[in-house]
From Swiss-Prot:
UniProt xrefs under CDD domains: AdoMet_MTases (cd02440)
Official protein name in the record: Probable methyltransferase PMT7
Domain of life from the UniProt record: Eukaryota
Membrane topology, record value: Single-pass type II membrane protein
Segments passing through the bilayer: 16-36
A Pfam family it matches: Methyltransf_29
Length: 600
């Protein structure tokens, strides 16, 4: 297919919807929360009336990128015209959660363990190598905090959840918007009421979840993540996840709302998070069979929970006496008792256990052959593509949490010492990123509301995220699985994140991040070869960054030069700025911004 045209579209329809929304929801931010809904359009030159049918009045200009379905080849060569654009039907392309590819694998997967819901990345030759387009009528997302309750319907144009979950107040259609009332399967009257009840249950009616010591939560099968959204006023950070399954596009809704979430499933492999990272694991009708397979999934929860952490279970076995629910409940009681958990509350459709810090109990139960204790070798490596373990460990990090999040952000996590990172290096990193983040905001020159979903693609010890903590945004701290395992230290700072290998695409929908930060990421991967090339990682960055989103790149001079040359071919604008590194040496930092384009 041939080249196309650039046409500048009118924002008038978006402005009309903006006015309607302001009338509906009251005194929000008078337009600044809606962004600029004026994309450039790519159309086929064969369309004889492309100029007249366009919403633009400014006329066409040349646009070199071609619309053509292109696959990854052994030798990567980007055309002079720029990276090809995928056809419109691929606007929700998620390489490692591709239903068509997974269907080919079904005969070899353990369906009883729901292995089909996990990551399955196709071989290179079956991966697309073209820019993923936005859907028809895509608009710059509504800004936080309005986005918690309202998002553009055209950005996630799927009605299934509204049809099957409307009675539970997950999401409702309101004209050209989706409205999220804050409900869920077990809290259809609203998450705030449910969260207060959990606080009462964990504190014996004396406080809330925060006073119960809950600061970091893992929400299993999170739906549209309203639970996480309404934990935010308490200052509680939640890692929400759900599979790409029959609950159509639930994670896409969550991310469009500006809530931390990722596609994942608890099935046959460990979750991509370190041991002892969460104060609470929450399951509200999460569709996980915890009682099956000798409770191996419950043992994964045990791995993830900190000592004295809570497991919240809101599901029929906790309260119903019909069908096989009592049998399931008995199995859960036996499993949790074997792991030395204590049932502290059971009422109003919810049961809560606490993982007691009782090594003597675990060793006694191991002697009674009620449980198996993991060997040291089982807990020593990053949780990336590691099979689930049918055992429990007793060597989780028991570092005492500082009294406040501010203290945690600046306190040296002792786990970093085991990774060869000194307290002086920690302090240097923390102070450096405070300075850099201030300069980043000046150089980006955007309203703080324009950046909500942020990813640090090579987070090291979380200094960048710690420096960003005072802004109205969240950061997904990614620690590459092939690098020093510092993610447990990041969690000890009160931050969150995940392991990942950038030789593969990330488990998220297209257009989900406003800012990607890459500090010497490309340098690390330049020795890994096919699938990990600079061009591969740039393509994945383009897939997951939102239109008008920023990509900040710091790296070796040769890599910075290469990215600067390639950026226009990915339809990125690029600026270079001279900043100082940690050791006061000047380095070139690239500020790339993805153009807002669409297929006409």
């Amino acid at each position: 297919m041939g080249g196309g045209y650039v046409l500048f579209g009118s924002a008038r329809s978006g402005q009309m919807i903006m006015v309607a929304l302001v009338l509906m929801v009251g005194s929000f931010y008078a337009g600044s929360i809606f962004g600029n809904n004026s994309p450039i359009y790519i159309s086929q030159p064969s369309s004889s009336n492309s100029s007249s049918s366009s919403p633009s009045q400014s006329g066409p200009s040349n646009f070199a990128n071609k619309i053509e379905l292109t696959y990854r080849r052994t030798s990567v060569s980007i055309p002079e015209s720029g990276v090809n654009v995928c056809p419109l039907k691929f606007n929700e392309y998620i390489p490692c959660h591709n239903v068509t590819y997974v269907q080919q694998l079904l005969p070899s997967l353990n369906l009883s363990r729901r292995e089909e819901l996990e990551r399955h990345c196709p071989p290179l030759e079956q991966r697309l190598f073209c820019l993923v387009p936005p859907p028809k009528d895509y608009k710059i997302p509504i800004r936080w905090p309005t986005s918690r309750d309202y998002v553009w319907r055209s950005n996630v144009n799927h009605t299934h959840l509204a049809e099957v979950k409307g009675g539970q107040n997950w999401v409702h259609e309101q004209g050209q918007l989706w409205w999220f009332p804050g409900g869920g399967t077990h809290f259809k009257h609203g998450a705030p009421e449910y969260i207060q009840r959990l606080g009462n249950m964990t504190t014996n009616e004396t406080g809330d979840l925060l006073s119960a010591g809950v600061e970091q939560v893992l929400d299993v099968g999170c739906g549209v993540a309203s639970f996480a959204a309404y934990l935010l006023p308490l200052g509680i950070k939640t890692m929400s996840f759900a599979p790409k399954d029959g609950h159509e596009n639930q994670i896409q809704f969550a991310l469009e709302r500006g809530i931390r979430a990722m596609i994942s499933a608890i099935a046959t492999k460990q979750m991509p998070y370190p041991a002892a990272s969460f104060d609470m694991v929450h399951c509200s009708r999460c569709r996980v069979d915890w009682h099956e397979n000798d409770g191996v999934l419950m043992k994964e929860v045990n791995r993830l929970l900190r000592p004295n952490g809570y497991f919240v279970y809101s599901a029929p076995p906790a309260y119903r006496k019909d069908k096989d629910f009592p049998v399931i409940w008995d199995k859960l009681v036996n499993l949790t008792s074997a792991m030395c958990w204590k049932l502290i509350s059971r009422k109003v459709q919810t049961a809560i256990w606490v993982k007691e810090d009782d090594e003597a109990c675990l060793r006694k139960n191991a002697e009674l052959e009620l449980i198996t204790i993991c060997g040291v070798e089982d807990v020593s490596k990053a949780s990336w593509k590691v099979p689930l373990r049918d055992c429990v460990d007793i060597s989780e990090n028991r570092q005492q949490k500082p009294s406040s999040l501010t203290d945690r952000l600046s306190s040296y996590p002792t786990s970093l010492r085991e990774k060869g990172i000194s307290e002086d290096e920690f302090t240097l990193d923390t102070n450096f990123w405070r300075e850099q983040v201030n300069q980043y905001w000046e150089l980006m020159n955007v309203n703080k509301t324009e950046v909500r979903n942020v990813m640090d693609t090579n987070a090291f010890i979380g200094g960048f995220a710690a420096a960003m903590n005072s802004y109205p945004l969240w950061v997904m701290n990614v620690v590459p699985a092939t690098m020093n395992d510092t993610l447990s230290g990041i969690y000890q700072r009160g931050l969150t994140g995940a392991y990942h290998d950038w030789c593969e695409p990330f488990s998220t929908y297209p257009r989900t991040y406003d800012l990607l930060h890459a500090d010497h990421l490309f340098t690390h991967y330049k020795i890994y070869g096919e699938g990990c090339l600079l061009e591969d990682i740039m393509l994945e960055m383009d897939r997951i960054i939102r239109p008008q989103g920023f990509i900040i790149i710091r790296d070796e001079e040769s890599i910075v030069s290469r990215v600067r040359d390639l950026a226009p071919k990915f339809l990125w604008e690029v600026e270079a700025h001279e900043l100082q590194d940690k050791y006061k040496k000047t380095e070139t930092v690239l500020f790339c911004r993805k153009k807002f384009w669409a297929i006409l």
